[in-house]
Swiss-Prot record:
NCBIfam families: S21p. One of its GO terms (cellular component) is ribosome. It comes from Prochlorococcus marinus (strain MIT 9301). Keywords: Ribonucleoprotein, Ribosomal protein. This is Small ribosomal subunit protein bS21. The lineage of its organism: Bacteria, Bacillati, Cyanobacteriota, Cyanophyceae, Synechococcales.
Length: 58
């Protein structure tokens, strides 16, 4: 769960930017998009293959 605490002198805009950054780094939206539709075994294999290639490059 992503949480952002707003400081006393902090504007809501900067807190919202921090929240959006945390959500994008955690990959929540990517998971939601992936789980929105049924994934065939071939698609799952291709996705995992891409993840392995990306991890190997790092």
């Amino acid at each position: 769960m992503t949480q952002v605490t707003v400081g006393e002198n902090e504007g809501i805009e900067s807190a919202l930017r921090r929240f959006k950054r945390q959500v994008s780094k955690s990959g929540i939206f990517a998971d939601l998009k992936r789980l929105r539709h049924h994934e065939t075994p071939v698609e799952k294999y291709k996705r995992k293959l891409q993840q392995r290639r990306k991890a190997r490059r790092r």
